[in-house]
Design a protein with these regions (language model features):
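Surface-exposed amphipathic alpha-helical segments
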Residues: 44, 141-174
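Signature of long, low-cysteine stretches enriched in small and polar/charged residues
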Residues: 83-139
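Secretory pathway targeting signatures of secreted, lumenal, and periplasmic proteins
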Residues: 31-87
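C-terminal motif of bacterial Sec signal peptides marking the signal peptidase cleavage site
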Residues: 1-2
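Solvent-exposed coil/turn segments that connect beta secondary-structure elements
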Residues: 63, 74, 121, 145-147
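Second-shell loop/turn segments in exported
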Residues: 67-76, 127, 150-158
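Post-signal peptide N-terminal segment of mature Sec-exported envelope proteins
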Residues: 11-32
């Protein structure tokens, strides 16, 4: 009996993720020609996208996460743009445990939109769109560059969610 080794299962270990403190800078300081502005995290790097005018990625190097942002001019196609944004959200619905929605209305800035929290092991943890309903439409979605695991990525998701909420609440058309 003394020669027999007893196997003991070992628990899975995960990296400890520490999220940085954040400060914000106006997006328009770096990109004054864009038709929108919002508060941008000082921990993020804006990557311009040449697929379409005014498309950007907001990359968080310390978290290896990206907020993919697209902009479209509204040309009597608001319903189509809104439906496309909703399609992107609900493509993840089979993996989401729930998708709470939060409406945003800032009449003084003519900004109206919806924020979606995709809970569970989804590729995108948070998405939103905002519009003025006549000229501008902006959509964004958050992605981490790793397999989705809501439990281990919870600190990252919460940090990015707070940044996205700050984006939406400070969003303005120019």
């Amino acid at each position: 009996m003394a020669c027999t080794k007893v196997s003991i299962p070992k628990p899975y270990g995960y990296y400890r993720i520490t999220v940085p403190d954040t400060a914000y800078v106006p997006f328009e300081q770096q990109y004054p020609a864009y038709p929108y502005t919002f508060d941008l995290s000082a921990n993020a790097v804006v990557q311009l996208q040449d697929k379409e005018p005014y498309w950007i990625n907001i990359y968080y190097p310390s978290l290896d996460a990206t907020v993919h942002c697209s902009y479209k001019s509204v040309r009597k196609n608001l319903r189509e743009l809104t439906n496309d944004a909703l399609d992107f959200v609900y493509r993840n619905s089979s993996f989401a445990t729930s998708i709470p929605e939060r409406e945003y209305n800032h009449p003084e800035a003519n900004v109206h939109g919806v924020l979606f929290d995709l809970e569970g092991n989804t590729a995108s943890s948070c998405q939103f769109f905002v519009t003025d309903s006549t000229r501008h439409f902006f959509r964004a979605s958050v992605y981490c560059n790793c397999p989705p695991n809501a439990d281990s990525l919870a600190p990252v998701y919460e940090y990015l969610r707070k940044d996205v909420i700050r984006m939406v609440e400070s969003f303005e058309w120019k």
